[in-house]
C-alpha cells in the first residue's frame, strides 16, 4: 500500500481508497488521483492498495484469480474489503469522508465493498468495472448514503456489453447512481473521464456533464 494523508488546516477532508486494475500496481491509481486534483489548488489524501496476487514473470498484480467463479470472486473481494474496513477503523480516519475508486477489477472490488459495507463509504467511483455474475444483485432496498459514479468507454470490449448493461441496471436500482460513457474509448481512461470525476466530487464549479447518459 502507498498512502498520502494531508493534515494541514483546511485540507480536503476526503480519503480516497483506491484499487488498480489487472496487471497493474498501486501507482496506477495514484496517477489517476493526481490527474483529478491537478489544478485544483488542493492535494488528495489516499490509500492506494496493491492486488493480493502477483503476476508471475510479467509484474503487476490482481485481486482475484483468472477464471474464478462468481462466489470465489466475491469471497476474494470480501476478504480484502473486511481488511480495509478494519484498517479504516482508526482515529486517524474518523473525520474523513471515505471514497472508493477503482479501475476494472479494482472497480468491481470497490462496488463489492460498497455493497458489503453500506455505512462506510460516501461514494464509489467505478471506472470500467468488471461485473460478471452480478445479475442477481438487487440494490432496490440498498439503505446506504453511498453515491455511485459508473464510467465506461463505448468501445470497451474487455468488459462484455452484457456485463456493462448489468452494471447499469444493478446500480440504477440503488437510486443513487450516475453514469457516463465516452465515445470511441476502449478499456482505458481519458481526459473527459477525469474531468467528470472531478465534477462528481465537486472540485469544479462547472455543473455540465458532456459525457452523461441515462443510467437505463
Model segments located where?
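Serine-hydrolase catalytic machinery in alpha/beta-hydrolase-like enzymes
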Residues: 1-94
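Conserved alpha/beta-hydrolase "nucleophile elbow" surrounding the catalytic nucleophile
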Residues: 20-22, 101-103, 153
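Alpha/beta-hydrolase fold nucleophile elbow
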Residues: 93-103
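Gly/Ala-rich beta-loop-alpha elbow adjacent to hydrolase catalytic centers
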Residues: 102-106, 110
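Hydrolases whose catalytic domains are alpha/beta-hydrolase-1, hotdog thioesterase
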Residues: 109-113, 135
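A conserved short beta-strand
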Residues: 119-132
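Short beta-strand/loop motif that positions the catalytic acidic residue
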Residues: 149-152, 156
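C-terminal catalytic histidine-bearing segment of alpha/beta-hydrolase fold enzymes
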Residues: 162-216
Amino acid at each position: 500500500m502507498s498512502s498520502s494523508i494531508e493534515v494541514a488546516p483546511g485540507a480536503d477532508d476526503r480519503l480516497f481508497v483506491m484499487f488498480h486494475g489487472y496487471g497493474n500496481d498501486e501507482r496506477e491509481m495514484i496517477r489517476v488521483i493526481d490527474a483529478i486534483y491537478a489544478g485544483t489548488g488542493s492535494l488528495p489524501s489516499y490509500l492506494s492498495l496493491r492486488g493480493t496476487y502477483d503476476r508471475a514473470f510479467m509484474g503487476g498484480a490482481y485481486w482475484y484469480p483468472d477464471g474464478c467463479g462468481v462466489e470465489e470472486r466475491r469471497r476474494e473481494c470480501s476478504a480484502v474489503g473486511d481488511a480495509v474496513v478494519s484498517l479504516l477503523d482508526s482515529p486517524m480516519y474518523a473525520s474523513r469522508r471515505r471514497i472508493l475508486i477503482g479501475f476494472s477489477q479494482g472497480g468491481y472490488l470497490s462496488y463489492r465493498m460498497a455493497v458489503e459495507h453500506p455505512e462506510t463509504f460516501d461514494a464509489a467511483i467505478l471506472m470500467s468495472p468488471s461485473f460478471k455474475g452480478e445479475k442477481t444483485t438487487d440494490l432496490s432496498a440498498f439503505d446506504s448514503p453511498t453515491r455511485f459514479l459508473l464510467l465506461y468507454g463505448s468501445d470497451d470490449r474487455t468488459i462484455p456489453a452484457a456485463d456493462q448493461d448489468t452494471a447499469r441496471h444493478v446500480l440504477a436500482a440503488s437510486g443513487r447512481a450516475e453514469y457516463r460513457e465516452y465515445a470511441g474509448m476502449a478499456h482505458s481512461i481519458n481526459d473527459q473521464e477525469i474531468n467528470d470525476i472531478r465534477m462528481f466530487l465537486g472540485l469544479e464549479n462547472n455543473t455540465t456533464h458532456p459525457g452523461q447518459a441515462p443510467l437505463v
